[in-house]
C-alpha cells in the first residue's frame, strides 16, 4: 500500500478525488482504520462510504456526498491530543449525545472498536454499533451506538 485516496461519486459514473493520504504521512494501521469507517467528515461536509477498493498498491474509498455535517453541542476538537474514539448515541432526537470518549495508544486500538458489532462502552456496558465515522475536522473517530435490541430510528 502506498496511498489511500477518497473519491466522490456523483451518481453519474464520475469520480472526483477529494483527499489523499500516503503511507509516509500516516501508518498502515491508520489506513486500515479509515477504511473501516462508514462516514468521513471533512471541511464541514459528510460523506458516506459506498465502496472500498484495491487498485494495485493503492487503496481507494468511494464516497457519496451527504451534504453539510450538522455539528452538535458537545463536540470538541481532539487535534494535537492524540488518537481518540468517541461513543455517541445514534439518535438524532437525542442530538447524538456524547456518552464518553477514550484515548487510544495506536490505530490498532481504534480498529478493535471499528471491527465490532457489539462493544463495551466505558461506564455504559455493552452496546450495539450502528455506524462509524472518522471526523477529520475534529481529529476523532466516532462510534454511534444504541442499547442492544433498541430500534435505531429517530
Where are these regions (language model features)?
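Short beta-strand-centered aromatic/proline hotspots
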Residues: 45-56, 125-136
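Surface-exposed beta-loop interaction hotspot
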Residues: 52-105
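Short, basic/aromatic beta-hairpin or loop at an interaction surface
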Residues: 3-21, 84-100
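Short, well-ordered loop/turn sites that connect or cap secondary structure elements
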Residues: 31-35, 111-114
Amino acid at each position: 500500500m502506498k496511498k489511500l485516496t477518497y473519491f466522490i461519486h456523483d451518481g453519474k459514473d464520475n469520480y472526483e478525488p477529494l483527499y489523499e493520504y500516503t503511507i509516509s504521512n500516516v501508518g498502515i494501521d491508520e489506513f486500515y482504520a479509515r477504511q473501516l469507517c462508514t462516514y468521513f467528515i471533512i471541511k464541514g461536509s459528510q460523506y458516506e462510504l459506498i465502496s472500498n477498493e484495491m487498485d494495485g498498491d493503492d487503496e481507494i474509498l468511494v464516497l457519496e456526498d451527504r451534504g453539510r455535517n450538522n455539528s452538535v453541542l458537545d463536540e470538541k476538537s481532539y487535534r494535537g491530543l492524540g488518537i481518540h474514539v468517541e461513543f455517541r448515541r445514534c439518535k438524532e432526537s437525542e442530538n447524538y449525545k456524547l456518552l464518553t470518549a477514550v484515548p487510544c495508544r495506536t490505530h490498532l486500538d481504534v480498529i478493535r472498536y471499528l471491527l465490532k458489532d457489539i462493544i463495551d462502552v466505558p461506564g455504559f456496558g455493552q452496546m450495539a454499533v450502528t455506524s462509524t465515522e472518522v471526523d477529520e475536522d475534529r481529529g476523532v473517530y466516532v462510534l454511534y451506538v444504541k442499547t442492544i435490541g433498541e430500534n435505531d430510528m429517530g
